[in-house]
């Protein structure tokens, strides 16, 4: 109802979130995480371990005072004056002026507020009251697990709006709503990467744009902010096929293993989740049998390691 908090009927409580290895050792631990009381521990762990912004949030913020935007919907900016004041009062320049998200309501506000802000900027609402109702309903639905966006939204959306975070451009683009032209993003967070999955093409070329090595760069850019990607590699020539400069190709599989290793080394969104990657290959490709047996060979390695470790224990 108007004037009431979207969390008025929801009880929140503090919990701990611990992720352990199979041997019991702790991978990550967060204490005093505030979440709705009706949430399961699994939901708590996902929010705390994956979706909380864990570093770099300025402790001191101020409204941007953007013209035409209601006070409650104003973007936030880093308040340098307050940060300097805290440092001077503490008589130390080593004062930590950043914090992390520890309350689910901070995340709900970051998401719903950013969505509402952009909607308000582009006249999606007839009145400010409609915008407020939209914001409140989103917060209520997120807290009650009635709706949830994809992971890149949890990772990236609202970091600039809610906390004034900024960073160098990462090679992303957006469509300018006024000119309808594709423009390069000026920074990493004002127009972040909130999309989940991408299908990318790859040419039978080693180093030029659109080629094999360029694909690994593009994939890394997507993985960094929490998205997944997939490609059909059927255009790449098979093992021992001739090259234009002489010699023969090392084959599709050698390059797929490079891409797989690169993806495995990247944590999506800078969290504990690994990158998501899909590889497709047409059935008439010369290397199709090697491709099909790729996973079989990896499973055989695991079986050999398990068998070997059990044998060693018996010795």
Language model region names:
Residues 1-315:
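Extended catalytic cores of very large enzyme megasubunits
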